[in-house]
Amino acid sequence: MVLDELISEFDRGLRSLTGISRMSRPVPVPTEPTVGELTPAERAHAAGLMRVNHVGEVCAQALYQAQKLTARSASSKAMFEEAAREEEDHLAWTAHRLKELDSRPSLLNPLWYAGALAIGVAAGTLGDKVSLGFMAETERQVESHLDGHLSELPATDTASRAIVEQMRVDEVKHGKAATDAGGIELPLPARMLMRAASKVMTRTAYYL
């Protein structure tokens, strides 16, 4: 059983890094038709933002894989699995949008993935309440990050905006579920360290 689980997660990791993630839900579509074309500068900026979002989803896969494997209770394992499945949709959606924008994922995805996997293992070994608290705080920070992207994306880029808006809905749900399941609030130094690490990742991934 443990071996089967490890093989399954290894397969998911490979799919995360090779861009062949499975999509269980279709790519969100704009509620209103796109008006006008993106300028080259707008297209480049949108691509940078969506590359950052794609990196975030690569990291989410690694985090939730590690937290699922180290979780003590069956209910916690199930929660991390459900979140990972929905985040895999996000991974596929952002990859799809990057192709539409004639861009590419981050060249450093293996590094981001490995780092997030290590962090997920560390959080998981501290117990389910801490691990769920880490999940809740991660989702809160991602929610804030997506709000920022919605304010930055060109108004005419309705395709990217539709994807980010649905991602935000899912992240809020994941964070609430983790808190409701008993996730504790992380100490301020831990939250600040998470924000600092996130800034390094987002600033680098925008270009690389």
Curated annotation (Swiss-Prot):
Enzymatic class: oxidoreductase
Positions with a binding annotation for Fe cation 2: E87, E139, E171, H174
UniProt cross-references to InterPro entries, sorted A to Z: COQ7_proteobact, Ferritin-like, Ferritin-like_SF, Ubq_synth_Coq7
Bilayer disposition of the protein: Peripheral membrane protein
GO molecular-function term, one example from the UniProt record: metal ion binding
Entry keyword Metal-binding: yes
Cofactor, free-text remark: Binds 2 iron ions per subunit.
Binding site for Fe cation 1: E57, E87, H90, E171
Cofactor(s) listed in the protein's UniProt record: Fe cation
Reactions it catalyzes: a 5-methoxy-2-methyl-3-(all-trans-polyprenyl)benzene-1,4-diol + AH2 + O2 = a 3-demethylubiquinol + A + H2O
Entry function: Catalyzes the hydroxylation of 2-nonaprenyl-3-methyl-6-methoxy-1,4-benzoquinol during ubiquinone biosynthesis.
Protein name: 3-demethoxyubiquinol 3-hydroxylase
Provenance organism: Burkholderia ambifaria (strain MC40-6)
Classification of source organism: Bacteria, Pseudomonadati, Pseudomonadota, Betaproteobacteria, Burkholderiales
Annotated gene: coq7
